[in-house]
Each structure stands twice: as structure tokens, then as C-alpha cells.
Amino acid sequence: SAEVKLYELKHGTQMSLKAASTLMANIMNGRRYMPFWVQLLLGGTDSEGSHIYSLDAAGGSIPDQFQTTGSGSPFVYGVLEDRFRENLSLTEGKKLGVRALTAAMKRDSASGDGISMCVIDSKGFQKVSPEEIEKIETTLAA
């Protein structure tokens, strides 16, 4: 956003994820009487590490180790709360994500029928290929 760019120009450094989350929460809160009916997930890495925030329509900002949103989120949370642990490898994290989303798709018709996945780390944003997701699904089904 323009506010983030302005911050970077003024301070000569990138805005932290916590500050970006607060900025977005303030924008959402400013529209509280005519809100954007969305729930946003804001995640990434900064000088303090990796972070993910859930932002609601009223401007609430909640940090956690993992976040989910949408109609299938209760099913996704069930899997994540059972299987998530600190310092998962990238491969383990992808498998856990596919397992959690597969559970939601099986139990919630509004969750759709397909998985899109990305990895956000210190190297940037990378989309996980459909072939890799299919390969993970196959190993989980076995």
C-alpha cells in the first residue's frame, strides 16, 4: 500500500509485519460502520522472524503460529491443532497443509475441490506446483 511505501521512504527500512498488521487493522477499524466484510490473513518474514496475523472486519489483529479462515476453517484448525509443532521442515509443513485442507474439502462442501498453496519465507513468495500438491495427496492417501 501507499502507507507502507511512505513508511519505507521516511525510515529507510521495511515496515515490520506487526506494524503492517496494525496499519491494516486501523484501516479496517476506520470502516467499522461500513466494514469490508472480509477476514484477511497477513503473513511473511521480517527482521524479527516469521509472522502471521488474522485481521477481522472490525479491525482486530490476532497473531498466532498458524491461521485459517473460511467455511472449512473449523476442520483445518482441528488438523493443525492436532499435528502442528514448532520447527516443522518445509516438507512436513506442506504435508500438514495438504492434510488440513483435504479434511476441510471432505467435510465442507463450500471449501471447493482443489488446493492452492504457496510458501512465504526469507527468499520471498513461491507457488507450490499442482504436481507437487498431487504428489503429496498421493502419499497421504497411501
Question: Language-model segments: what does each one mean?
Answer:
Residues 1-142:
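Long, low-complexity N-terminal extensions
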